[in-house]
From Swiss-Prot:
It catalyses: malonyl-[ACP] + acetyl-CoA + H(+) = 3-oxobutanoyl-[ACP] + CO2 + CoA. Keywords: Acyltransferase, Cytoplasm, Fatty acid biosynthesis, Fatty acid metabolism, Lipid biosynthesis, Lipid metabolism, Multifunctional enzyme, Transferase. The last Arg residue of the ACP-binding site is essential for the weak association between ACP/AcpP and FabH. Gene3D superfamilies: 3.40.47.10. It is an enzyme of class 2 (transferase). GO terms for cellular component: cytoplasm. Homodimer. Disulfide bonds: none annotated. This is Beta-ketoacyl-[acyl-carrier-protein] synthase III. Catalyzes the condensation reaction of fatty acid synthesis by the addition to an acyl acceptor of two carbons from malonyl-ACP. Catalyzes the first condensation reaction which initiates fatty acid synthesis and may therefore play a role in governing the total rate of fatty acid production. Possesses both acetoacetyl-ACP synthase and acetyl transacylase activities. Its substrate specificity determines the biosynthesis of branched-chain and/or straight-chain of fatty acids. Residues 248-252 are annotated as: ACP-binding. It comes from Tropheryma whipplei (strain Twist). It holds the Pfam family ACP_syn_III.
C-alpha cells in the first residue's frame, strides 16, 4: 500500500517582536495578566507591506532547500489560510509562480486554525491515490490585519506567520488516519465582526472576536475526545507518542488538553505560542518547526497534531516527524 510522509519543514515568522507592554494600555491590562492567561511573552507580526504570499513563499523556500528539491519536483501545492485579500488567484498559484513550479495542482482551503491539519489530510489522500507524488503544504495567516487594539477577547493573542511542509510517497505510514469535523451550532463563538465587502457600504473594517470561555471549554473537553479518537483509529497509545503539537491557541488550553489526553511526562509539548503568538493556519507547522529545531532527536518519532478553530471545526492526525 502507498503511504506519505513529511520530509522537510520551512518557517516564516513576522519581522517584529511585539511584547505585551506594547498592547496593555488600550485593553487596561498587564504583562502578568496576559502571560498568566495565555502564556504569551511576545508575538511575531509582519511589516505592513508584507503579504501572505510573501510569507508563504519564504516558508516554502526553506522547506524546498531542506528537502533538496527543485521546484519542478512539486506537483501539488495546498495552502491553508483565512487572510488572503486577493482571493484569486489563490495563494497556492502565487507561490507556485514565485518558486517556479511547472505544472501542479494549486489549491487554497479555509478551515481557520484547523487548516493545516485539513491540508495534510488532503495531501496525504492525493499522494495515496496517485494523483500527486510530491506536495508542498503551507499554513499561512496575517492576523494583524484584523486586530482591534481595544478588544480584550483575542487581540493580544494574534500574530503573523507561515509554516510549510513537503510530503512525498512512502512505503511506510508517515501520516496517520485523520479525524475531522465541525460544530456549526457554535458559529458565532469566534470569527470576524463583518466582511470586507461590508466596508463598501460604510461599515468599519472587520476585526476578530471570540467568546473566550465557550471556546476554552470546547477546545479542552471536545478536542480531548477528538484527540483520543485519533489515537484509537491509529491504534496508538498515549505512551507511544514522543511529541504533542496542538494548535497554539493559548497555553492553558494546551496544558489542559495534554492532561485530559493522559500524555506521559516524557512527551514534548509544543509551546511555540509563548514567543510566536497565535498564527491560526500557520500555528501547527510553526510549532513543529520550532520543536524539531530545538530537539533534533525527534526526527523519525511519532507526534499527535490537532487543529481547532472558527466554524467551529477541527482536524488532526498522527505524524512521523521529519
Amino acid at each position: 500500500m502507498r503511504y506519505s510522509k513529511i520530509v522537510s519543514l520551512g518557517a516564516y515568522r513576522g519581522e517584529r517582536d511585539v511584547y505585551n507592554d506594547e498592547l496593555i494600555g488600550p485593553i487596561n491590562s498587564s504583562d502578568e495578566w496576559i502571560r498568566r492567561r495565555t502564556g504569551i511573552i511576545s508575538r511575531k507580526r509582519a511589516l505592513s507591506g508584507t503579504t501572505v504570499v510573501d510569507m508563504a513563499y519564504a516558508a516554502s523556500k526553506e522547506a524546498l532547500n531542506d528537502a533538496q528539491m527543485r521546484p519542478e519536483d512539486i506537483d501539488l501545492i495546498l495552502v491553508a489560510t483565512i487572510t488572503h485579500f486577493g482571493h484569486t488567484p489563490s495563494v497556492a498559484a502565487h507561490v507556485g509562480f514565485r518558486i517556479g513550479v511547472q505544472d501542479a495542482i494549486l489549491l487554497d482551503i479555509n478551515a481557520a486554525c484547523a487548516g493545516f491539519s485539513y491540508a495534510i489530510f488532503q495531501a496525504d489522500l492525493m499522494i495515496k491515490s496517485g494523483v500527486a507524488s510530491r506536495a508542498l503544504v503551507i499554513g499561512v495567516d496575517k492576523l494583524s490585519e484584523f486586530i482591534d487594539p481595544l478588544d480584550r477577547t483575542i487581540s493580544f493573542l494574534l500574530a503573523d506567520g507561515a509554516g510549510a511542509a513537503i510530503l512525498v510517497g512512502s512505503t511506510s505510514m508517515g501520516i496517520g488516519k485523520t479525524v475531522c469535523g465541525g460544530n456549526p451550532g457554535q458559529l458565532e463563538s469566534v470569527g470576524l465582526t463583518g466582511s470586507t465587502t461590508d466596508v463598501k457600504s460604510g461599515s468599519a473594517w472587520p476585526t476578530l472576536r471570540q467568546e473566550g470561555s465557550s471556546i476554552f471549554r470546547w477546545a479542552v473537553w471536545q478536542m480531548a475526545k477528538v484527540a483520543k479518537q485519533i489515537l484509537d483509529i491509529n491504534q496508538v497509545q498515549p505512551g507511544d507518542l514522543n511529541a504533542f503539537i496542538p494548535h497554539q491557541a493559548n497555553i492553558r488550553i494546551i496544558d489542559e488538553l495534554a492532561k485530559q489526553i493522559g500524555l506521559e511526562e516524557n512527551v514534548l509539548i509544543a509551546q511555540d505560542i509563548c514567543k510566536t503568538g497565535n498564527t491560526s493556519s500557520a500555528s501547527i507547522p510553526l510549532a513543529m518547526h520550532s520543536l524539531i529545531k530545538g530537539n533534533p532527536s525527534l526526527s523519525g518519532e511519532l507526534a499527535l497534531q490537532i487543529g481547532f478553530g472558527a466554524g467551529l471545526v477541527y482536524a488532526g492526525q498522527t505524524v512521523v516527524m521529519p
